[in-house]
Every structure is written in C-alpha cells, then in structure tokens.
Amino acid sequence: MNKLNVWSVVKDGAKVGGANYWSVFCTVILYFLTVWIPYLNVGTTIAIQQLSVELAKGNRIKPTYIFAAKYRRRMGEFLVLEGIMLIAMIVGFFFGVIPMFVLSMAWGLASMLFVDKGLNALEALRESNNLTYGNKWRIFWAGMIVGLAICLLAGIAAGVCAALEYKVLGLVVEYILIFLLVPFAYGINAIIYRSLVLERETSEVE
C-alpha cells in the first residue's frame, strides 16, 4: 500500500499544475462556458473527470477533448455513480457530518477510475475505497492546505480592495483569483491518482 506524503503531494501537485497551467485553465474555462448546454454538459462533465488522470500520466492536454462523443456513451452509468455518492453523502451528513467527509475522501478517486479504467459505478466506489484506505486523512490535509492557500490569497486581494473602498471589485477579484488557481487543485488530484493508482499498478507488474 502506497502511503502519501502530504507535503510531497502539495509540492508536486503545484509543479504539475504550474507546468500544465494554461491547458488546464482553458479546459476548465471551456467546460464552464458550455456546461449550460443540455446533453452535451453530461459528456463534458464526465470528460472533466479525465483531466487529472491525463495530468497524472504526463499526457498533453487538448482542451477540446471534453467534447469527444465517447464520454457521452456512459452517461447513464455516470449518473448512477454520482447519484449513489450524492445520496450517501446526504445520509452521512445526517449521521453527524464526519461520515460525509470520510466518504468524500474514500470515494474521491471513483469518478476518475470510472472514466480511466472503465469500471461500473459500484466497482469504482469499491476500488476507490480500497485505494484510499490508510490515506484518507493525508488526502484531507493536502486538500486543506491547498484550499486554505487559495482562500488566503483571494482573501488578501479582496481585503486590499475593501480597504480602498472597492468592495464589489474585491469580491470580483476574489472569485477571479480562486478560478485562476484551479489548475493547481487539478495538479494535486493528479499526484494523488498517480501515487495511489498508477504507481501501484507499476509496482504490481514489477
């Protein structure tokens, strides 16, 4: 079982996000510009799950890949997967919130495994749970560090604007900064996927 190192995940994730910044950023922008289009939006939502996988494999990202017809073929199965996760999260919330967070980390790889490995909904959830076993809190802290860093930078920018009595501008700047830093979040996911899935497969072959 691979054990994640929180600081290595953050550091390497930032490198991956930075090295692929514009391709990831353009992909995310393209996704949000077209997410309102019925039917197509399901395919692009499935495709966007592949983004961190491609980064983990070191592949070059072409933003228009999200429109490939192959992603729409498994629309029904994907909706089943997302539906199961959503219902379980809601139930977890009513059991004291903490189960919801545990499930979100345990199943964090499910959508990527669904797209990359062609697993069905239950297989993806089971495999994700197995792969993240013993690493859930490491994943949590890696995400927390990145999230806090992004919010801190955005908050400072918004605070400066507010101090200059440009409160509306401050909010706009805050959201823009958060959006601009999204590629680094994808980089973090890529390192987690690479460490827990791809490197594990390589070690098993050897």
Language model segments and positions:
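Interfacial aromatic "cap" segments that immediately flank transmembrane helices
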Residues: 2-33, 64-91, 103-156, 190, ...
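Selective recognition of hydrophobic, aromatic-rich stretches within alpha-helical transmembrane segments
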Residues: 31-61, 86-126, 165-201
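Juxtamembrane "helix-exit" motif on the non-cytosolic side of transmembrane helices
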Residues: 156-164
